[in-house]
Curated annotation (Swiss-Prot):
HAMAP family given in the database record: CysH
Single GO term (MF): phosphoadenylyl-sulfate reductase (thioredoxin) activity
Active-site residues, record numbering mapped to chain: C239 (nucleophile)
Pathway: Sulfur metabolism; hydrogen sulfide biosynthesis; sulfite from sulfate: step 3/3
Origin: domain of life: Bacteria
EC number: 1.8.4.8
GO cellular component, one term: cytoplasm
Pfam families, per database record: PAPS_reduct (PF01507)
Protein name: Phosphoadenosine 5'-phosphosulfate reductase
Catalysed reaction equations from the record: [thioredoxin]-disulfide + sulfite + adenosine 3',5'-bisphosphate + 2 H(+) = [thioredoxin]-dithiol + 3'-phosphoadenylyl sulfate
Amino acid sequence: MSKLDLNALNELPKVDRILALAETNAQLEKLDAEGRVAWALDNLPGEYVLSSSFGIQAAVSLHLVNQIRPDIPVILTDTGYLFPETYRFIDELTDKLKLNLKVYRATESAAWQEARYGKLWEQGVEGIEKYNDINKVEPMNRALKELNVQTWFAGLRREQSGSRANLPVLAIQRGVFKVLPIIDWDNRTIYQYLQKHGLKYHPLWDEGYLSVGDTHTTRKWEPGMAEEETRFFGLKRECGLHEG
């Protein structure tokens, strides 16, 4: 596998970009997660960042990438509606792993948004998508631009939902390389990694949550539910950050 030219790939249509990365992805599938991170740091351009929602299994990718690339900027898009347990978990992991945390928020406060638009998350798919654009997508786009990012690491896994089932290790999204080192990990591998390194699940894991986002669009898991049904009232799985 050789170094890749981001500018040249960005000039290609999306389908051609996917085909151009196919051979590299075939090789990356054979590497372990640490090998994928090391390859990306050697062959993809900086600046590098890692995004995290500090969700149920967030400690895995935060520990894994930060061990190989200490002080890598960690981007959190804070909606202002996270669980209190999430904010405390962020503080705990930032201190424990010595994270270089970069917090980005919407340009409008949560209260101002409610005054202008009402409770967008109660306004069906269209309202949820607008909410996500304001609170997740725009802040992330701003972070990528301000930090001059060319390579973005994230902790998505195929097992998490149908929308992630066919994601490759390496893609181009929002004009930058996107690397998913643990894309093929299952829940057992996640558990083993946490145990091996003395790391914890999000505190709400013990209360029956499989996925954690905002307080108003996250539900506890109940028998018969798919994991993706615990978010956004089952209307959609993605918050917008990992789409497009």
